Swiss-Prot record:
The gene is rpmG. Keywords: Ribonucleoprotein, Ribosomal protein. Signal peptide: none annotated. InterPro entries: Ribosomal_bL33 (IPR001705), Ribosomal_bL33_CS (IPR018264), Ribosomal_bL33_sf (IPR038584), Ribosomal_zn-bd (IPR011332). The keyword Transferase does not apply. One of its GO terms (biological process) is translation. Transmembrane segments: none annotated. The keyword Ribonucleoprotein applies. One of its GO terms (molecular function) is structural constituent of ribosome. This is Large ribosomal subunit protein bL33.
Length: 64
C-alpha cells in the first residue's frame, strides 16, 4: 500500500538581512530548517531566529 503525502512538510528559513545586505561584512546567509503544518499554516512562515553572521536576532522567511 502506498503512503499518503503527510500534512507536515520540511521548509527552509533564510535570513532576510543577510540576503539583502549590500556591505561585504556578511560572509554567508543564515539558514534554518523546520517543519510546518500545511493545513494550519498556508502562508509563508516568518520566525525571529539568531543569525550568526549578523550576531543578532533577525527575521527568517520561508524560501522555496
Amino acid at each position: 500500500m502506498a503512503k499518503n503525502k503527510g500534512v507536515r512538510i520540511v521548509v527552509t528559513l533564510e535570513c532576510t538581512e543577510c540576503r539583502s545586505s549590500t556591505e561585504k561584512r556578511s560572509q554567508g546567509v543564515s539558514r534554518y530548517t523546520t517543519e510546518k503544518n500545511r493545513r494550519n499554516t498556508t502562508e509563508r512562515l516568518e520566525l525571529k531566529k539568531f543569525c550568526p553572521h549578523d550576531n543578532k536576532m533577525t527575521i527568517h522567511k520561508e524560501i522555496k
